[in-house]
Amino acid sequence: MSAKFDISFANSASLENALAIVLQASGEAQAVAGASEADPGGVIERASKISGFSAKSMATLDVIAPQGSSADRLLVIGLGKPSKLVAHDWLRAGGTAAAHFKKADKVVIYLDAPGVEVSAEAAADFALGLLLRAYSFDAYKTKKKSDDEKTPKKVDVTIVTAAHKDAEKASAVSEAIAGGVILARDLVNLPPNVLGPVEFAEKAEELRKLGVDVEILGEKELKKLGMNALLGVAQGSARPPRLAVMQWNGGSKKDEPIAFVGKGVVFDTGGISLKPGLGMEDMKGDMGGAAAVTGLMHVLAARKAKANVIGVIGLVENMPDGNAQRPGDIVTSMSGQTIEIINTDAEGRLVLADALWYTKDRFNPKFMINLATLTGAITVALGNLQAGLFSNDDELATRLAEAGEATAEKLWRMPLGKDYDKIIDSKFADMKNSSGRLAGSVTAAQFLKRFVGETPWAHLDIAGTAMGSPLTEINQSWGSGYGVRLLNELVRAHYED
């Protein structure tokens, strides 16, 4: 059960029966925001000396409010050195605060730490951190944890800051971003018997209420388009495939659209090339790329982004049955290129091959970025701390990397090249869908590159970051929602009117 926060901004607030949270930068001689109101007895200074608290980044000090304060509890959050503060630290501080709400139903947060410049954007980022940390997924638990049962469904949160008027306006964007990230997390966390291709497409259709144009292509339309690579993956499942096309037209009519394409394998058994049983339950998250694209479209529409954006997601289930695709099959993709199937567990690239070609052919976008939980090889290379970035365009790659640094959804650029491309040549078709273990993430990217033509393109392999990544101040969920904030920042920084 996710906590519900009613967040407001003000220049002062009543502390009666509240949890009071104050922020402190290191090296500020124990000065804290809101000290005169929340801590008239100076208990924070005394407790800091006794405990050795020095306001290091995201360190906390939790004390009972002193006599003379109308608050119930005091929490100090360290910000570290002011010179080292970056935008993402405000999200982390918000998440740290939310983790300490416990049973409080009223919280007052003094944001203006001495020695720290707090902008409206910083205050809004703090609020975003609160919202993201509040998320939890326990919809299918009939008995909640005892702490959760006692947690109030609604917490009144007042953020006290001199920038309160502008922060209130800026927080609307924070709410939009939180909504998109939470949508992506929900999609990844949902069980596969609940979220099939049809049900996922219905989730995409719900974006219409935000003004997104949504078109759903069924099996008949996909066959007519010649999407045999995508259809080949789906043919072993009793659940029919879908292609969801989402359009947000917030920019000028003359502006070229930008496009995001997501892999949406709602469950991946590996097909005939069956995966080991141990850990297969995690393959409900093999649609993390499609979840991120859907979450991004939510954000852009909710905040009324001034850009024309296309989101395309290929939705299939990869199952073994008597009609399933076989190793040795050859399929003709929408592009006309032929593909020899070597491994049916290299299915995501087949879905993306047709989805990318369709997007390029129909919309002629300024660029295309695809997201996919594509290869286990990328987790060997980068673990679950960064996603792999492959691109045929240096400017796009640089902008993506910068957005990754700004949002802490980090990317590491990986190589592409003719020598790698040769590895996926087939004896019997134009290419093969798998070339073995060596350079697995690179050859997968080379495969995708054959379906983008001259369009500037980037491929983000998010196999290590979309699910099961390390828990942070702003994410305590198995499904992380990775990519939503990253791509929203890319659009905001470079592609809005």
Swiss-Prot record:
<keyword id="KW-0479">Metal-binding</keyword>
<feature type="active site">
    <location>
        <position position="349"/>
    </location>
</feature>
<keyword id="KW-0031">Aminopeptidase</keyword>
<feature type="binding site">
    <location>
        <position position="268"/>
    </location>
    <ligand>
        <name>Mn(2+) 2</name>
    </ligand>
</feature>
<dbReference type="InterPro" id="IPR023042">
    <property type="entry name" value="Peptidase_M17_leu_NH2_pept"/>
</dbReference>
<feature type="binding site">
    <location>
        <position position="286"/>
    </location>
    <ligand>
        <name>Mn(2+) 2</name>
    </ligand>
</feature>
<protein>
    <recommendedName>
        <fullName>Probable cytosol aminopeptidase</fullName>
        <ecNumber>3.4.11.1</ecNumber>
        <ecNumber>3.4.11.10</ecNumber>
    </recommendedName>
</protein>
<dbReference type="InterPro" id="IPR008283">
    <property type="entry name" value="Peptidase_M17_N"/>
</dbReference>
<keyword id="KW-0378">Hydrolase</keyword>
<dbReference type="GO" id="GO:0030145">
    <property type="term" value="F:manganese ion binding"/>
</dbReference>
<dbReference type="Pfam" id="PF02789">
    <property type="entry name" value="Peptidase_M17_N"/>
</dbReference>
<dbReference type="Pfam" id="PF00883">
    <property type="entry name" value="Peptidase_M17"/>
</dbReference>
<keyword id="KW-0645">Protease</keyword>
<feature type="active site">
    <location>
        <position position="275"/>
    </location>
</feature>
<feature type="binding site">
    <location>
        <position position="268"/>
    </location>
    <ligand>
        <name>Mn(2+) 1</name>
    </ligand>
</feature>
<feature type="binding site">
    <location>
        <position position="345"/>
    </location>
    <ligand>
        <name>Mn(2+) 1</name>
    </ligand>
</feature>
<keyword id="KW-0963">Cytoplasm</keyword>
<comment type="similarity">
    <text>Belongs to the peptidase M17 family.</text>
</comment>
<feature type="binding site">
    <location>
        <position position="347"/>
    </location>
    <ligand>
        <name>Mn(2+) 1</name>
    </ligand>
</feature>
<dbReference type="InterPro" id="IPR043472">
    <property type="entry name" value="Macro_dom-like"/>
</dbReference>
<comment type="function">
    <text>Presumably involved in the processing and regular turnover of intracellular proteins. Catalyzes the removal of unsubstituted N-terminal amino acids from various peptides.</text>
</comment>
<dbReference type="InterPro" id="IPR000819">
    <property type="entry name" value="Peptidase_M17_C"/>
</dbReference>
<dbReference type="GO" id="GO:0006508">
    <property type="term" value="P:proteolysis"/>
</dbReference>
<dbReference type="InterPro" id="IPR011356">
    <property type="entry name" value="Leucine_aapep/pepB"/>
</dbReference>
<feature type="binding site">
    <location>
        <position position="347"/>
    </location>
    <ligand>
        <name>Mn(2+) 2</name>
    </ligand>
</feature>
<dbReference type="GO" id="GO:0005737">
    <property type="term" value="C:cytoplasm"/>
</dbReference>
<dbReference type="GO" id="GO:0070006">
    <property type="term" value="F:metalloaminopeptidase activity"/>
</dbReference>
<keyword id="KW-0464">Manganese</keyword>
<feature type="binding site">
    <location>
        <position position="263"/>
    </location>
    <ligand>
        <name>Mn(2+) 2</name>
    </ligand>
</feature>
